[in-house]
Amino acid sequence: VNYNTRFYPLNQHARQMVADGELGDIRLISGHYMQDWLLFDTDWNWRLEPDKGGSLRAVGDIGTHWIDLTSYITGLKVTSVMAELSTFVKTRQQPVGPVETFSQAGSGETIAREITTDDTALLLLRYENGARGSVVISQVSPGRKNAMQWQIDGSTSGASWDSETPDHLWIGHRD
């Protein structure tokens, strides 16, 4: 898997800030990764089928990118996870015949299919240094095409980045 957001310039800069101790000891890592491409019951992709894409759809498809990025920036590994997985679109219309990702559903024939993979996930994380984290992952958030955001809070400063404004890095200080 190509975790390409690691290489955005401001994510590289944030990683260097953490390595240089500019945030202090990392205490809290939070954020989200939201998309809308599977919002409707007529949206279909092979990732919906557990035998093809695995049982963890939203977590496996996009959540791993957020966890990789924040672990890369902080240098911290996740040691435990508590997850709340939800499937809101429990039945989808699978087109008969080939399907192209992100294409509009045609007026062709469909088959109703039960969905067991996750549309959303709420994850609580523990990191090896004792830091805590939380992330919301969704593939059913209207208007969010590919919105990844992280906030990293240390003992002296915090930093935040959002993929929808990738040329901005927020840095916060108490004073």
Question: Residues of each region from the PLM?
Answer:
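NAD(P)-dinucleotide binding in Rossmann-like oxidoreductases
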Residues: 106, 111-175
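Predominantly a Rossmann-like dinucleotide-binding segment in NAD(P)-dependent oxidoreductases
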Residues: 5-114, 169
